UniProtKB/Swiss-Prot annotation:
Name the UniProt record assigns to this protein: Transcription initiation factor TFIID subunit 9B
N-acetylmethionine sites (modified residues): 1
GO biological process terms held by the UniProt record: DNA-templated transcription initiation; negative regulation of apoptotic process; negative regulation of intrinsic apoptotic signaling pathway in response to DNA damage by p53 class mediator; negative regulation of transcription by RNA polymerase II; positive regulation of cell growth; protein stabilization
Matching Pfam families: TFIID-31kDa
Any GO MF annotation of the entry: protein heterodimerization activity
Species for this entry: Homo sapiens
Family: Belongs to the TAF9 family.
Length: 251
């Protein structure tokens, strides 16, 4: 923007000539042409506002016309609102010094959120970790047990434990041969009186145990039971006694 000594044209309005003369009296000789228009607009708005306020004050005082006292009061009130400057620095320092001399109030113990007592607050862990017990490689394995007691006439029934789940690692086991073991137990029947030896037939009972329950080997338990053919003679001892008496008479 170019600036220089501006002179209003001779055919300019009277208000523009007056504003140019005011700027010249204040020592302002270089300005843009639009400055005069802005100053005229500002002066018109300011004068209109002052006259409106003076009219309000005059009507409040119940005066028939607006006089100079009303205009002075309106200018004084408008000057306090429109043309204000910040207070001096020394004045602000004095006010700040007086404020800082006043100690701050103590912090209240119940400041912040009102929490219940500590025993009702979940501010600490209320649980305990339980360590897991690791099972060894031999734990949980079933071991076959055979109990040998007194020989009786009744065959003993082997008891098998309840199968349990055993975790097997994902490894390929080496091939192994499955062998079977045979146990032969001969159980003679109980006799109260000596009798003559009579050929008897032997009944064999085989009991096969599942290998998955006891181990990699199959165990075959064989029980031999001697059945007597002269059960009728033992059941009727009087008849046998009569036969022996007849033999003695013949002799």
């Amino acid at each position: 923007m170019e600036s220089g000594k501006m002179a209003p044209p001779k055919n300019a309005p009277r208000d523009a000539l007056v504003m140019a003369q005011i700027l010249k009296d204040m020592g302002i000789t270089e300005y843009e042409p639009r400055v005069i228009n802005q100053m005229l607009e500002f002066a018109f708005r300011y004068v209109t506002t002052i006259l409106d306020d003076a009219k309000i004050y005059s009507s409040h005082a119940k005066k028939p016309n607006v006089d100079a006292d009303d205009v002075r009061l309106a200018i004084q009130c408008r000057a306090d609102q429109s043309f204000t400057s910040p207070p001096p620095r020394d004045f602000l320092l004095d006010i700040a010094r007086q404020k800082n001399q006043t100690p701050l109030p103590l912090i209240k113990p119940y400041a912040g959120p009102r929490l219940p007592p500590d025993r009702y607050c979940l501010t600490a862990p209320n649980y305990r970790l339980k360590s897991l017990i690791k099972k060894g490689p031999n734990q949980g394995r079933l071991v076959p047990r055979l109990s040998v007691g007194a020989v009786s006439s009744k065959p003993t029934t082997p008891t098998i434990a309840t199968p349990q789940t055993v975790s097997v690692p994902n490894k390929v086991a080496t091939p192994m041969s499955v062998t079977s073991q045979r146990f032969t137990v001969q159980i003679p029947p109980s006799q109260s009186t000596p009798v003559k030896p009579v050929p008897a037939t032997t009944a064999v009972q085989n009991v096969l145990i599942n290998p998955s329950m006891i181990g990699p080997k199959n165990i075959l338990i064989t029980t031999n039971m001697v059945s007597s053919q002269n059960t009728a003679n033992e059941a009727n001892p009087l008849k046998r006694k009569h036969e022996d008496d007849d033999d003695n008479d013949i002799m």
